[in-house]
Amino acid sequence: MSGRDNRGAGGGGGGGGGGSGGGHHHHQPLSSAMGKLKEKLTRVGDDLGYHRVESNLSTSNTATSLDTILPEDPFLFPQEAPQRHPQQSPSQSQQQQRRFLDDEPPLSFRPLLEDDDINEPPTQQQPQQQHQQQHRSPLSASGSLELTPLPPPPTTLEPRDRQQRSIPGEDLQRSKQSLKGSRVSFEKTNSKQAAESSDEDSFEDKRIGFQQQKATSVDHKGILKDLKHILANDNRRQFQAKKHVSLDVKGTRFLQDLLKESSSEEEFHKTRREFQGRKHQSLDPRVTFKLDKVLQGSSTDSDEEGDDAEHKRLIHRPKDITKPVIIDLKDLESESDEDFLTSRQHFQQQRSISTDSRKSRRLYEMDDMGNKRGDNIRHAVPFVRQITEDGKPKLEVYRPTTNPIYIWTQVLAALSVSLGSLVVGFVSAYTSPALITMTNGNITSFEVTPQAASWVGGIMPLAGLLGGIAGGPFIEYLGRRNTILTTAVPFIVSSLLIACAVNITMVLLGRFLAGFCVGIASLSLPVYLGETVQPEVRGTLGLLPTAFGNIGILLCFVAGTYMDWSMLAFLGAALPVPFLILMFLIPETPRWYVSRGREERARKALSWLRGKEADVEPELKGLLRSQADADRSATQNTMLELLKRNNLKPLSISLGLMFFQQLSGINAVIFYTVQIFKDAGSTIDGNVCTIIVGIVNFMATFIGIILIDRAGRKILLYVSNVAMIITLFVLGGFFYCKDKAGIDVSNVGWLPLSCFVVYILGFSLGFGPIPWLMMGEILPAKIRGSAASVATAFNWTCTFVVTKTFQDMLDVIGSYGAFWLFGAICFIGLFFVIIYVPETQGKTLEDIERKMMGRVRRMSSVANIKPLSFNM
């Protein structure tokens, strides 16, 4: 009986005992025994083969299931070999086997792709493919698979049904899952070579050798080699510990080579910046940016051509479309430099992760990949984490400025508005020296009664109250700069009215107009400086108006000793002229432009203040965000906005500082310095004492300028409070001993002057300038104009009350009672500062506002999130 007839007539035992063949009944017991042995060996062989494949997969570098391309043992699956007649010799069987293999049709293979049905069971219409899957051999030298010749079975076995030669359904399903994305080419078996394999051990040796071979993907093997080399390199770890390197691991290697080959650190930094400026690649080594247009021609030196070529080789690996790709970046490929930079920045913002981090190591750990058994990497380690725009609680509005030209533009702006403060100081101190000559009938052509003299000193604070109320709408609708500018001409007019006065009415009218301008200026000057000066110098430049105000007071005291009230008024009319000229040179605040929707004007103002070469876009974006937040929460009624809970706290702190500033008695001391020294019986001339007080006030302000950005606001307020408390109680004790106890104090006549000097020194360090400075810092942007108006009006109200009632206070409770009352108020103010006043040193206005209002507003993103910084 021929082999073909035996295959057709034999009864098949699918997985169990052997079927009985036709015709040779004397071999039936032997066939039954061999069938059972064959069934057992089949089960053992299947389990052994798959266990080996699975154990090898756990440590394999590829995600390809090897069991689908292993040749099946013809001893375990004898139906694959041509059936040999029991009486045939081995040589005849081998010849018949060669003819069987030669008669087989050509084998055709194709890669198993994603769209293959993994649940498709083997059918009878697929015998050729099933036959191919069971006869695959180890890889050839070219990377393809060849069919291995099958040795003839050692004994005579009954044939099986041809329909049962396929792999079981569950094994085929697992094999197809693991082969997804892989690309394997196959070649037809060489029939002559197949006939040369005759012993049983060759199959086991070849299968073990095949399983021990490395990954079939040359590209993947190269990437793994590079990654393992980088991760195991101690020099790279030491390099990364000192420097912040690129996210791209191949870029890291490139930077390390640059560092080794650079002759100096400066050359390395230059080359690194050029490299990072044109290249930022994904962590995934299989994702490639098209950077040919950027990289070509970027290196001109012959020494760098090798590094450039190596770098191009690393980032331009050949792609295999059948391999799984973690992220598809086709949408990020740009056609222009601008689009490329935008796409790169967008990609960088999706994920910031260091190549040396634990998560990055896990991404490339082959054990983790093997344990997933062919799953896509994106399911094992997430690669992209979407971040929201509000992910980073930080606003990058201000940046430190070190270029002197940037500082001097801000100094010019501060100096210009400070000249207005000099005029304010001169006008405020005018009554102290002027009333001495104004009440002299020999000098003045009109009569000045004591009551009229009291109104000359007291009407200015009252007018300042009205000016502070009107100044709020002015700075919102006219602008900060324009509001300050409009006070220059009225200052000149008011001084001319006083200088040319022929009656007391003209003097009072001039003082009222001057006081109105003082109220507006005292409101708008701090707001302007707070919105134009950077945090690094805001404390120092913010005290310039106070310093120039003290200069104006000192100038008035000194000039008053040599001039009468009329000539002193003419001097006051000349001081606003340089102030008027300089105000035309400085710009409006960028914040006001932003509040009016004039973004381009705001950009130009920032460029003027920060310098033409400065990058003002981050600061401008911060201003736009702040204004957008303010617009969303703003109401139509501005005054009702002040009463909101979030706005009430900063407004209350500002009002409290103004209250304790004026109730410390400073204006009473300044306005009535000469009279106080006369009442003290001091042997020193009153005008000289006034000049000494002015000099101390001026010098103390400059000490505060030096310390305010070093020690902080609250420390200076503590020192100021303690100094005023001690001196006021000592002065009260001095006047009590002199007026009430009748003790002779002539031997301590120097004590009032000493106490006044320490008192002025303490006031000028803290409570003099800081309330005005913090008014421009702690008030929220959306209510800054109206809140500053209320605070200024409250300050001038307190000034008017103290100045107008100080003489009456002396009559009722005496000098000692007045000073003790002021000292007690300062003692309460110390606890107010400790409990409620925040420290604003070195903080941006947005940071201060968030802290004061007790909420977190929408922030800029990572981010901001800032794209990855390559500063080392």
Curated annotation (Swiss-Prot):
Keyword Methyltransferase in annotation: no
Extracellular face residues: 428-454, 510-511, 560-566, 672-687, 736-755, 804-816
Region (Disordered) location: 1-40, 53-217, 262-281, 293-315, 340-361
Biased composition (Gly residues): 8-22
Keywords for the protein's UniProt record, in alphabetical order: Cell membrane, Glycoprotein, Membrane, Phosphoprotein, Sugar transport, Transmembrane, Transmembrane helix, Transport
Biased composition (Low complexity): 55-68, 84-98, 121-132
Function as written in the Swiss-Prot or TrEMBL entry: Low-capacity facilitative transporter for trehalose. Does not transport maltose, sucrose or lactose. Mediates the bidirectional transfer of trehalose. Responsible for the transport of trehalose synthesized in the fat body and the incorporation of trehalose into other tissues that require a carbon source, thereby regulating trehalose levels in the hemolymph.
PANTHER family: FACILITATED TREHALOSE TRANSPORTER TRET1-1-RELATED, PTHR48021
Protein name: Facilitated trehalose transporter Tret1
The organism's taxonomic lineage, starting at the top: Eukaryota, Metazoa, Ecdysozoa, Arthropoda, Hexapoda
